[in-house]
Amino acid sequence: MPGYKDFLKKNKVNADKIKTWTDFQSVPPVSKQNYLRQYPLGQLCFDGKLDNKALVFTATSGSTGPPFYFPRDEVLDGQYSVYLENFINNISEKKRRKSTLVIDAFGMGVWIGGLITYQAWRMLALRGYPITIITPGINKKEIFDAFNNLAGHFEQVVFCGYPPFVKDIIDEGEEVHGINWKKMNIKFLFAAEAFSETYRNYLIQKTGIKNVYRDMANVYGSADLGAMAIETPISILARRLAVDDDALFKILFNGANKIPTLAQFNPGFINFEASEGSILCTGYNALPLVRYAIGD
């Protein structure tokens, strides 16, 4: 990456001398301000080029300035599919693969959630899992039509969406459309926002979820690096125990004002560091990032 090579040179870092973890921690962090917006986009990519690769662009929200466009290739989609494979195996009784309808209700368009979720589930289907996908995005009519007309053809439904939007669908489905969620074998995949255990309990009560630890999971992801981590049964258990145990809460969350997401990651995909109260990420993308201050 010519841009990163220049960044290291300007910061007087000799990459050949970075041999140990301690050495690595001396490398200056990068951010949108000091790195991504300082170089032409192509200079941030492998071999300094964008136009000779099969890429998909995703935009940041632009909430803190102009949107930044991250290119990605199929590697990030594949990493996400590994997390989803673990999730689908967790919800499979006796490891038998159930026929599954995936309703992808994340926003489509330039945002990462909808498309990367579709692509990751599609990869799983191509690996032999009996998965069928529909992508209504945030179109409520299409979501309710999918539940009413398609869900009954499958042994289980995985509903994927932004937590507040998922709650809207569950409430409106019951109150306006007369859907009996407890008759559906529904599972949930969330992303884009942390939520409380009260929220999780609410969905359990509304939908009759049988296994709180296996039947729903929140993904920690970003436009920058895709799906970076996911809740697992053990992380959900630890989080729920911490709600009622101040000592455990302090150990896990170091005095946070509200309960954060607790997720697990694959160190073969990404690395996390805690630095002065913020998170630094190192991970692969078509635009690789080393000690990147993601803003969390």
Pin down the residues of each PLM region.
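Nucleotide 5′-phosphate-binding alpha/beta core
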Residues: 1-100, 104, 149, 153-154, ...
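Conserved AMP-binding
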Residues: 106-110
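Residues at alpha-helix caps and immediate loop-helix transition turns in enzyme cores, especially N-
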Residues: 113-117, 199-202
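Active-site glycine/GP-rich loop and adjacent strand/helix microenvironment
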Residues: 126-295
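Conserved short alpha-helical elements in the N-terminal third of ANL/AMP-binding
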Residues: 114-128
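Hydrophobic alpha-helix position signal
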Residues: 8, 121, 173-174
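Phosphate/oxyanion-binding active-site loops and adjacent basic polyanion-contact surfaces
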Residues: 75-84, 111-114, 136-139, 161-165
